[in-house]
């Protein structure tokens, strides 16, 4: 496998800034890197601005929109495959990342910071790296659900006691469809389809997104719902009557699903050296700490980073042993089943 050399440390970049034109530099001598990021602009932009302050490398960022979730930027990378404009793809989930890898749209990279990540969050072929995760959790309204009736599993959304009073995000985009694909890979098609059928039979409320799930529970319109930690923590920390449950974390459970942000360098990236430096910077414990401290409370995966005290990570709660590659393969089947059950 071909590996690429890396410059160790941001300081080296600054030291070399005046040493003549670098690869990817414009005729004026400035250096830049193009990143497509699906993480909310309010969270990702300050991180990218800090990279520029430390290195002098200008970051040209293309941000995703809420309406297209992470799919819009993935499709843009596909459309530009003959003449790539993007250097670094910063995705906020993993299934589209694996699909782009399978389509040959990423290149191998070997950032020094990757050694601080467990194997579960690194592509064995060196084409993507996971960091700054979210957990798939159940947000519960404590005014509506007594302690003794608290859900402990994603299967509790299909409990007849709560018919019509539980919720999920529309399972066609983002982390929700990624979760469904992981269930197909982990449980098998039949069991995953049976689970989706049980949700539909229980009149689960389908919201436009995970934020809608969280606000519905916080406002008392729904008793409990499946969502992401970043949306749940906002309601919890704003003082709403809610608690966060990490589902299926008992010894005999399948575990709570953690879904990372991912980083990859696009094949034939125009600014390869700058892309390598940006990826290594984003994987640093410093960046994970900043993302953990922001309102979305991202979960650090770098072993050198301190755990986020606001939410639990995979070292603190039983984590689902998700086979993301198998989930990506199952995705087309999962989406077909979802469309048949929730769009008709």
Which residue ranges define each predicted feature?
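Short beta-strand->loop
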Residues: 36-39, 63, 124-128, 140-143, ...
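Periplasmic-binding protein-like
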Residues: 133-134, 195-200, 206-207, 240-272
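A bilobed periplasmic-binding-protein/Venus flytrap-type ligand-binding module shared by bacterial periplasmic
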Residues: 137-144, 181, 185, 258-271, ...
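Mature extracytoplasmic/periplasmic domains
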Residues: 261-322
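Early extracytoplasmic/lumenal segment of secretory-pathway proteins
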Residues: 19-98
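Ligand-binding pocket segment of bilobal, Venus flytrap-like solute-binding proteins
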Residues: 171, 175-178, 182-247
């Amino acid at each position: 496998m071909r590996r690429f050399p890396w410059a160790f440390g941001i300081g080296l970049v600054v030291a070399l800034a005046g040493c003549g034109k670098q690869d990817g530099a414009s005729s004026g001598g400035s250096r830049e890197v193009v990143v497509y990021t699906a993480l909310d602009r309010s969270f990702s932009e300050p991180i990218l601005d800090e990279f520029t302050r430390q290195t002098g490398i200008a970051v040209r960022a293309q941000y995703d929109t809420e309406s297209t979730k992470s799919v819009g930027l993935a499709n843009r990378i596909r459309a530009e495959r003959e003449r790539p404009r993007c250097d670094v793809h910063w995705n906020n989930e993993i299934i589209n990342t694996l699909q782009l890898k399978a389509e040959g749209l990423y290149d191998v990279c070997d950032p020094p910071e990757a050694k601080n990540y467990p194997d579960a969050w690194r592509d064995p072929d060196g084409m993507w790296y996971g960091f700054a995760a979210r957990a798939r959790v159940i947000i519960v309204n404590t005014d509506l659900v007594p302690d003794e009736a608290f859900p402990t599993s994603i299967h509790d959304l299909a409990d007849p006691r709560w018919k019509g009073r539980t919720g999920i995000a529309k399972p066609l985009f983002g982390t929700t469809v990624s979760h469904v694909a992981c269930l197909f890979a982990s449980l098998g098609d039949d069991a995953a389809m049976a689970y989706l059928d049980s949700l539909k039979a229980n009149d689960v409320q389908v919201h436009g997104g995970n934020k809608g799930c969280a606000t519905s529970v916080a406002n008392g319109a729904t008793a409990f719902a499946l969502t992401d930690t970043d949306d749940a923590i906002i309601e919890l920390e704003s003082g709403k009557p809610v608690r966060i449950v990490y589902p299926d974390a008992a010894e005999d459970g399948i575990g709570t699903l953690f879904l990372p942000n991912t980083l990859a360098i696009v094949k034939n990236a125009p600014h390869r050296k700058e892309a390598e430096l940006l990826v290594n910077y984003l994987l640093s414990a410093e960046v994970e700490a900043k993302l953990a401290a922001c309102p979305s409370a991202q979960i650090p995966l770098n072993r050198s980073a301190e755990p986020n005290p606001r939410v639990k990570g995979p070292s603190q709660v039983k984590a689902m042993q998700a086979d993301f590659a198998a989930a990506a393969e199952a995705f087309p089947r999962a989406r077909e089943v979802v469309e048949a059950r929730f769009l008709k």
